[in-house]
Amino acid sequence: MIFVTLEHILTHISFSIISIVITIHLMTLLIHKIAGLCDSSEKGIISTFFSITGLLITRWIYSGHFPLSNLYESLIFLSWSFSIIHMIPYLRNHKNDLSVITVPSVIFTQGFVTSCLSTEMRQSAILVPALKSQWLIMHVSMMLLSYATLLCGSLLSVALLVITFRKNMDIFCKRKNFLIKSFFFAETEYLNKKRSVFKNTSFLSFRNYYKYQLTQRLDYWTYRIISLGFIFLTMGILSGAVWANEAWGSYWNWDPKETWAFITWTIFAIYSHIRININFQGTNPALVASIGFLIIWICYFGINLLGIGLHSYGSFTLPSN
């Protein structure tokens, strides 16, 4: 009973802290001159990380197994993974460009766990025989870490596509306006317009340079986060194959979950191949990664909710027979 109460407290503490953190982020977007807000935000994420860590440890102690057996536990671990990803640039003293993605991801996951899941779905249950293996920690943790990192990388690629699209639209509109004005206005008026354009050239070039730097940083972090997630996904699939051979006598059964994991792996393998090619950097790999965002949610959430296949017991609370 004490552990259940402690788990309940830690769940709400982590959600409250991350809510405060995202409020601070919104304030920094509106008011840049308030000192200490950014540091408070980073400390809040660290506090959230320790709260979720305590929650997982508490769950592990009173359930008697590593907390990765149902939807509730996997979502808590996913939220924990997002908080780890957030702290990577912070620990390396880099500018944290990931906070725009990781902080909303943590609050969305924690909010869903706190508000949307029923009490029955949060209950710990006895593991089915197939899950009573040391491979549970290795396989499921690697898969969830890969989901978290690949989701962050995919969202960064979506942001890259949006910025690039807006930039191209601005260029198109300027060219269109230029053609219309040069066709309808007199030569003298055109020259006056041209002079005013030259006066604003420094401002426009600065703004374009800022967008260029932003897209470069997004591309940099997208590639590195997805590369890390791809490694986790590969390790998760390989460890799952070994575990499947021990449990079911076959390394691969083309179960719906396995099939979609393979599709996910293929999508991000294509991304890595395109991204390495210098002729296709930029929007082309970002487009592939953004498609991967939907594929991951189908693989993680969609297949489990359908309740089909050998992995269907990983979604909801298991019966304690």
From Swiss-Prot:
This is Cytochrome c biogenesis protein CcsA. Its main location: plastid. The gene is ccsA. NCBIfam families: cytochr_II_ccsB (TIGR03144). GO terms for biological process: cytochrome complex assembly. It comes from Dioscorea elephantipes. It holds the Pfam family Cytochrom_C_asm. One of its GO terms (molecular function) is heme binding. It is found in: Plastid, Chloroplast thylakoid membrane. One of its GO terms (cellular component) is plasma membrane.
